[in-house]
Amino acid sequence: MASILLSLNTHTLLPLHTRTRTTKTTLKILRFSHKLPPSSPFYCNHETRLHLRCQTTTGTPSAADFAAAAGQDRLRKVPIKNIRNFCIIAHIDHGKSTLADKLLQMTGTVQKREMKEQFLDNMDLERERGITIKLQAARMRYVYENEGYCLNLIDTPGHVDFSYEVSRSLAACEGALLVVDASQGVEAQTLANVYLALENNLEIIPVLNKIDLPGAEPDRVCKEIEEVIGLDCSNAIHCSAKEGIGITEILNAIVERVPPPRDTAAMPLRALIFDSYYDPYRGVIVYFRVIDGNIKKGDRIYFMASEKDYYADEIGVLSPNQMQVEELYAGEVGYLSASIRSVADARVGDTITHYSRKAEQSLPGYEEATPMVFCGLFPVDADQFSELRDALEKLQLNDAALKFEPETSNAMGFGFRCGFLGLLHMEIVQERLEREYNLSLITTAPSVVYRVHCVDDDIVECSNPSLLPEPGKRRSVEEPFVKIELLTPKDYIGTLMELAQERRGEFKEMKYITENRASITYELPLAEMVGDFFDQLKSRSKGYASMEYTVVGYKESDLIRLDIQINGDPVEPLATIVHKDKAYSVGRALTQKLKELIPRQMFKVPIQACIGAKVIASESLSAIRKDVLAKCYGGDISRKKKLLKKQAAGKKRMKAIGKVDVPQEAFMAVLKLEKEVL
């Protein structure tokens, strides 16, 4: 029997006694108090045994063997009183993903050599933008006061576009870490997610991150949290996720303060889906939290909202990689594979139950994903239309909120009208299409869903400006409004109020949350936000202001359709719906831009902005004049007049039958301008 040393983590060397066999190595981990801190995930009593099978002839376990043993240790069933389900709430760039990385590392869930920044963020796009787009989950094992605990971290996106996914993640937890940057303080989106957490009755643990920064003011931020949110910060944890300060205190607080799940194992199965994604080999993989009952491999399961049933081919836990188990009980978090073909069959927020013993009621809070922002996507190369369709279908397998339908334009050919949750969602989908599928795209100006009340009492929902009914056929038009909350330093209150009023905002209230920061609330049309509102907000506040919005419903507005005509022909992709008061300024800006960009023709080209048959703004592109008199060296004037008359007749005929080709660059520049001026 040989005595060897194995490095368990960054700070511990543990003597191991090994017993060599040809095909089986048994590791007996002994407890050495002076060597191994009690907070370590590998701290255990004398009876603990980790068995692993490996092909070995030397008796010395490899790093892979040890990782396998540690993984099996995390799979061990723990009593429900020792389970803790929690998530992390934070504004963008307040250190949520860094803290999650450090928790995974400190609990030994991920070895240091495997560690990379934003470990739970799998997409390159997430790492580049520094945001979380898709949810992830991780099961960690942590030993506290000689007792093993199972900690389930459910990662959440922080952006307002994904607030529904955040709400379903919170519903799968009993507690939340509220992470606030100690140098910046409370931000608008943090506030919105905290209110969601309070609605779900979660135990909230305040964590002040980035205390190592020179500008950190933890005492001021504590006071701000107490005043703005109303949370007691006397026991707030000060930490630096980057430097690893305060991580042990956070883990201890999760065990001490987050309540365990209710013991409802005897009830019929009810499991909440908080995420799903499409795997090309196994179909849809569903992430879920078991609320009541238990689920076994091979069970016939039923999705209560989609009314579909499947057999659970594989179930397991996320640690953070998928590890198979035979059964999951109430309170546990895991995944399942059931050869599901479409993400639409297993939507976020749906309830899983047994087919033979259905639950009486589904879990509350399920909503269909409703697109709020629409735009047209057209391939620059018409030959890429089928590739664009295939790419959208593949993205939709992973993203049930993405909607699309074919659209045809005289100017840009065949494309798709796509619906998104919000502007960030739209940008992410466009970037993924271009990056992952090598497509070159033209996007039309984003629009929202308008509700049109027609004279025959029909109600039509319209997201495409070119499909808006004629003025004589509609009685009124309604548009979606949002309630927007701006958090800003007091120096920028005036300029941000001016911005909101420029965008048809209706002032609701303003309050000072601290001596130097204010919260301003407005109601304004969603259409006014889908342009450059966020860019203007950051520009006018020098980056210090933040915002959060919620849709409050539809209101009637004085809206009209503004058409652009070139040489008398309407250009459908440039049509837009605007408020009557802004029609002239938008029309003038678009016609002037087109005049700069369209190449001159052999005949005069009028560029007009029209409301119905009425022209409200017009520019003319002067003709290229060919010198037909160049070959005349004098002589009779009638010869020159005849040539000029013939040229004028030709230009008149050309103007009647000629077509003006709007170059691709002009389209892209004007569409960009539309996004800015609307």
From Swiss-Prot:
Keyword annotations: Chloroplast, GTP-binding, Hydrolase, Nucleotide-binding, Plastid, Protein biosynthesis, Transit peptide
Ribosomal protein keyword on record: no
Transit peptide: 1-43
InterPro entries: EF-4, EFG_III/V, EFG_V-like, EFTu-like_2, G_TR_CS, GUFP, LepA_C_sf, LepA_CTD
GO cellular component, one term: chloroplast
Catalyzed reaction equations: GTP + H2O = GDP + phosphate + H(+)
Record keyword Disulfide bond present: no
Residue ranges of every copy of the tr-type G domain listed in the record: 81-262
Subcellular location: Plastid, Chloroplast
Gene3D superfamilies in the cross-refs: 3.30.70.240, Elongation factor 4, C-terminal domain (3.30.70.2570), Elongation Factor G (Translational Gtpase), domain 3 (3.30.70.870), P-loop containing nucleotide triphosphate hydrolases (3.40.50.300), Translation factors (2.40.30.10)
Pfam families the record matches: EFG_C, GTP_EFTU, GTP_EFTU_D2, LepA_C
Binding site residues for GTP: 90-97, 155-159, 209-212
Molecular function in Gene Ontology: GTP binding; GTPase activity; ribosome binding
Biological process, per Gene Ontology: positive regulation of translation; translation
UniProt cross-references to NCBIfam families, sorted A to Z: lepA (TIGR01393), small_GTP (TIGR00231)
PANTHER family: TRANSLATION FACTOR GUF1 HOMOLOG, CHLOROPLASTIC (PTHR43512:SF4), TRANSLATION FACTOR GUF1-RELATED (PTHR43512)
Family: Belongs to the TRAFAC class translation factor GTPase superfamily. Classic translation factor GTPase family. LepA subfamily.
Role summary: Promotes chloroplast protein synthesis. May act as a fidelity factor of the translation reaction, by catalyzing a one-codon backward translocation of tRNAs on improperly translocated ribosomes.
Protein name in the entry: Translation factor GUF1 homolog, chloroplastic
Record organism: Populus trichocarpa
